[in-house]
A protein has these predicted regions:
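Beta/alpha (TIM)-barrel catalytic core signal, keyed to glycine-rich beta->alpha loops juxtaposed to Asp/Glu
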Residues: 1-184, 197-204
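Short coil/turn segments at secondary-structure boundaries
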Residues: 189-194
Length: 204
């Protein structure tokens, strides 16, 4: 059964008072759920899918600023596509790699996403960075309270991702990138469905 946000927040408040957790957050939430929970126990951060290909949660940014809540961006590279290291010839083993069934990795998607890849290449050249670093820097420079959490399987990629923190984009540059992204017709992407209505809670 669905549990009211106030009830969840009360439990989190108890855990904080007991010293068992320091902060708490909500994954894939709605504004209403966030506000109701926050009134009972201040929410530290929410976690939602966010990348250059999935930007629908930007509508929540004013609310997050109002409440002082951070934004943890998962899948900030669209499951690796925005690293610009893959091509239409890339294949994944469906038995071991879930990207095999993701729409952004279909052959026709690479054709449709060429303008996006071109944008990433141009920005990477301008800033002497990689496409992954540009994708991460774009969101980190957009708001200081956005924290991307890209996944990786090797140390070299981890170091590359950390390097994104050294890239500085002005507010004007970020707005220009957003404006260009608005004009690009992109392929379908995994996780592009509406917000999940039943949030999950996370304690730490």
């Amino acid at each position: 059964p669905a549990i009211e946000p106030e009830a969840v927040a009360e439990v989190m408040a108890d855990l904080i008072r007991e010293g068992k957790i320091l902060h708490w957050g909500i994954s894939e939430t709605t504004e209403e759920y966030l506000r109701r929970a926050h009134r009972v126990c201040p929410v530290t951060a929410i976690q939602n899918r966010y990348s250059m290909m999935v930007r629908r949660h930007e509508t929540s940014f004013p609310v997050l600023e109002e409440l002082g809540v951070g934004f943890v961006a998962f899948s900030p590279l669209a499951n690796g596509l925005l690293s610009n290291r893959y091509t239409a010839e890339t294949t994944f083993d469906p038995a071991t790699d879930y990207r095999a069934s993701m729409p952004q990795y279909r052959r026709e998607s690479f054709v449709k996403n060429r303008p996006l890849f071109a944008l990433l290449e141009r920005l990477a050249d301008e800033h002497r960075a990689t496409a992954s670093q540009i994708s991460l820097a774009w969101m980190m420079n957009k708001r200081s309270w956005i924290v991307p959490i890209p996944g990786t399987r090797c140390l070299c990629r981890l170091k590359e991702n950390i390097g994104a923190t050294d890239i500085r984009l002005s507010a004007e540059e970020v707005r220009a990138i957003d404006a260009e992204l608005d004009t690009i017709e992109m392929s379908e992407v995994f996780g592009g469905s509406p917000i999940i209505e039943k949030p999950k809670t996370e304690g730490e």
